[in-house]
Amino acid sequence: MSQFWNDKIKSISPYVPGEQPKDKKYIKLNTNENPYPPSPNVIKSVKSMDIESMRLYPDPDVTLLKDEIAKYFNLTREQIFVGNGSDEILAFIFMAFFNKQDKVYYPDITYSFYPVYSDLFDLTEVQIPLDSNFEIKIEDYFGLDGHIIITNPNAPTSIALTLDKIESIIVNNPNNLVVVDEAYVDFGAESAVKLVDKYSNLLVVQTFSKSRSYAGMRLGYALGNSNIIEGLERLKFSFNSYTINRISIESGIESFRDEEYFQECRRKIMNTRDYTTTELQKLGFNVLDSKSNFLFISHITANASDLYQKLRDNGILVRYFSKPKIDNFLRVTIGTDEEMQEFIAKLQKII
């Protein structure tokens, strides 16, 4: 601690990211990274990058990438915001649209950055309990007196709401901003992007990190009413005009252009997820219905914390949360077929 820390820094509990081990090589199933490389077109773009251009600032408006995203979703450039990963965009949302002491509603079991942002920006967080099946009861979100953030599919539970349920929440909160964080939407859920033109109080956030194998490059984007997007732009240009580097912009464009590769990777991950689910159930695991690139699992007899440590000792990293209600669950990222076969083989010896 330093004498120069302000009161907020002294009191805040920062977000704890998943382990990125440096001591030895593990099968990494703990941070929901894509097991496959980016599109070959992306790799080619990076390798052919004009090094001389690195001395120049990138386009602060990220125009070409916005245009590519807008074309993909049949929106306009003015409806797209691009940030340095979706986490940055979420932080910008908390800063741009929520006043101090505003209420912000989200599930009690969800992305753990939300409480950090609520604390950091002096908001009143209201955590709405999931039901006994770890599902969101949409009626709990009707007619609220504050803004709403929903991760869909939810994390770490992996369960998705249908689009009609998302729309019901939006319709029943006409004066509140409804943010739908869709980091994992490409693995079987239905995106709310198609509702963007219909509702001015909807903001959808997506990322390149999961389905586009871009976690190391840091790219995310938001889609919404042009007036909402303008608010994000005003904040960004009051904070840091150049949040996206040249390599990310140029290669990100190529990622959106290679639809065939994108769909192929999605299919492989979802097929491997189905295989892994079946094998885990044979071993006595309860596996929640996943629409994500990970599984949320608990065993009928084995303790989750013990399983986490035994798997780690056997060279496999998964994610364990000590939070009440989910402290006997593990979150397991879907890797390659070979990685998941090894994961199952280790569990067969451990259980």
Describe the residue ranges of each PLM region.
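Phosphate-binding glycine-rich loop
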Residues: 63-103, 301
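PLP-dependent aminotransferase-like
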Residues: 96-151
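Active-site phosphate-binding strand-loop segment of PLP-dependent enzymes
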Residues: 131-186
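PLP-dependent enzyme catalytic core of the Aspartate aminotransferase-like
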Residues: 164, 310-314, 319, 323-351
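PLP-dependent aminotransferase class I/II
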Residues: 201-281, 285-288
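Conserved PLP-binding catalytic core of the aspartate aminotransferase-like
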Residues: 270, 282-314
